[in-house]
Amino acid sequence: VLGTLNTWLVWRLGLLIGNKKTGWYAALLYTGSLYATVLCGTFILPDTPLGAFYLASLYFMLRACGCTNDAQEKPSSFIWAGLFAGAAMLSKYTGAFLWLGTLLYLLLYNRKMFKNPWLWAGLFLSLLLVTPVIWWNSTNPASGLSFHADRVAFFGKKPQLLSLGREVLGSFLYNNPVQIILLIGALRYYIHLKRRQRTKKLFRIVLFQSVPMVAIFFFFSLFRDTLPHWSAPAFFPLWLFTAAVLAKQNRHKPFRWSLGFTAVVLILGTLQIRTGMIPLPKAEAKTTSDDPYAELGRHDVTLDMYGWQQLTEAFGRVQQEQEALYSASNGEEGMPPGAAILATRWFPAAHYDYYVAKPNGTVVKTTGPLDKTHKYEAITQDRGGIQPRERLYYIASSRYPQSVPDVLPLDTVFVYRNKKPVIRYIISRITH
């Protein structure tokens, strides 16, 4: 639903800065982005609501600043911009770049706007919306701000060109290589030709809405491992600018290549998830075990989306057997009804929780340091914590290196894809 809404919002943004052709081209560019189509339009991630609120806020930011086809400033739009920017920040912290880009633009090119009360009202509304988040993070040990700050902390770190290279290449792929080429062409076209004043305003605010986010995350990636989708919202305004230039040039053939690339990636990705038809290169083993299945599927990211139904059914069978044994032995053996599953990290704890525990009428609890369990520290406490000698299940996966002591294996489960084993799970119970 939000994916469709986002496409409509991009079309409306195109109309705002140009005409129907600009809106159509902007919608095509948005659809051609793997980040927009898959992460924002298909998956259930923080990026999903972020994308919708980001685009809505950007629409009203452009109206307020007069970066539109009629070049008229409408400062009252800052109220709506602030509302949606606040909602974007509630979805993900990167929503703050909406205000950063706008304020930088106003500081350099439209300082008189700082005297307008609508601007400050919009800023206040955004801050009001994120105040609960700020308060919770300042009073809770499981601070999300602290967690994410640690992920990008670079003091004392040596530059890692490989990490930077992965970030650049990832951004190139997430946002569609064909469209990156179109973007570069649009920038060259603008730079080499004199544009009208309203186009200058659009170009300037696009730069301030995009460059800071991309530059900051590229800088972080020089010292820490980052993910390309962190900076991907910065490309939304860049697609608008590209659409405006392509509409001016009346070019439409490049969209065949752009959408064709996305279609091919989606088709091949779906086939790979379902069949594993593309052989993946083997990475260096992390363990020295002689067990041939110790790291089965470890380096295949497509398995994140495969095999959960098989594991769920296998766990359900083990659960029924253990509960029957518990009942027959008056609690001396087996596992009590509703016994929780123990995990040591928030990932794959969240997967186990949704795909395995919930369908089988139980929950997941975690143990370990806060930086590993994160929000599941609080979730575990809400679920009653872990009691002394509490009987718990543990699921060891060949895809993850985590393990716990004092376990008694109950069953070994192989997930099959295309008649080949791709993951091994060992379902155990904690013996304490």
Predicted regions and their residues:
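Transmembrane-helix motifs of polytopic, lipid-linked glycan transferases
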Residues: 2-18, 56, 60
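Aromatic/acidic, Gly/Pro-rich catalytic loop(s) in extracytoplasmic/lumenal soluble domains
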Residues: 310, 316-319, 323, 362-432
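Short helix- or helix-capping micro-motifs
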Residues: 26-32, 85, 89
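Transmembrane alpha-helices of multi-pass, membrane-embedded glycan-processing enzymes
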Residues: 1-9, 30-33, 50-53, 238
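Specific aromatic-rich, kink-prone transmembrane helix
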Residues: 49-69, 80, 84-85, 238-241
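Short acidic/glycine- and proline-prone juxtamembrane loop motifs at membrane-interface regions
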Residues: 41-49
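Signature aromatic-anchored transmembrane alpha helix within multi-pass, membrane-resident enzymes
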Residues: 248-285
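Transmembrane-lumen/periplasm boundary regions of multi-pass, lipid-linked membrane glycan transferases
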Residues: 87, 98-203, 209-224
